UniProtKB/Swiss-Prot annotation:
Keyword Transcription regulation: no
Organism for this UniProt entry: Arabidopsis thaliana
Name by which UniProt lists this protein: Probable ribosome-binding factor A, chloroplastic
Family: Belongs to the RbfA family.
InterPro entries in UniProt: KH_dom-like_a/b, RbfA, RbfA_dom_sf, Ribosome-bd_factorA_CS
Cited PROSITE patterns: RBFA
Keyword Transit peptide: yes
Amino acid sequence: MPNLLHTNQSHFFFLHHPPIYTVSSKTQAFHFPQSMAPVNLRTNLSVRRTVRCMANPRRVKMVAKQIMRELSDMLLTDTVLQHAVLPEAALGADRYLSSLTTISDVEVSNDLQVVKVYVSVFGDDRGKDVAIAGLKSKAKYVRSELGKRMKLRLTPEVRFIEDEAMERGSRVIAILDKIKAEKGSGEGKTEPSDSTEDDQDWEVDDPDEDIIYVK
């Protein structure tokens, strides 16, 4: 409430004080005017907003292509990543012996925060499991290497995902090739002709052979 001030001229003046807010703590209470009050006290509802800047779609595609090139090069030249994909390579074994790992696709989020790397692994089940597990274990290492190779304000988080589409496609192609080969071999086989039977029929004596017909 405003305070009432009396003067000698019998005029009244109202002294207005800004509303005072009190915040209690474990030790003492703090008093401050409304302009200095926390946001959650000045408004009934405190709203937390997260602002994300979306990059240009063209730039997103360019970043995805560059990441795909860098990762493909790392699979060929980086020994740390090669040994993670195929541990036998560290012992001197052929790194193409049990599995072959390739980067099939790369997707970058619109805010350039996350990159999904789709990996195709050709080989037996054990080789696939080892390769995918090795790549996932080196996700932070790959992110740091990408930060060194690429000029980005923020290096995106790397997530490796197994891509089974190419393997399924190769299986379908193999099945179609097998069917085509079987069909071609079936058409190449000639059916036994009846020419030999016809020859045998001609060799049989004709009962009317010795009969002379007179007109």
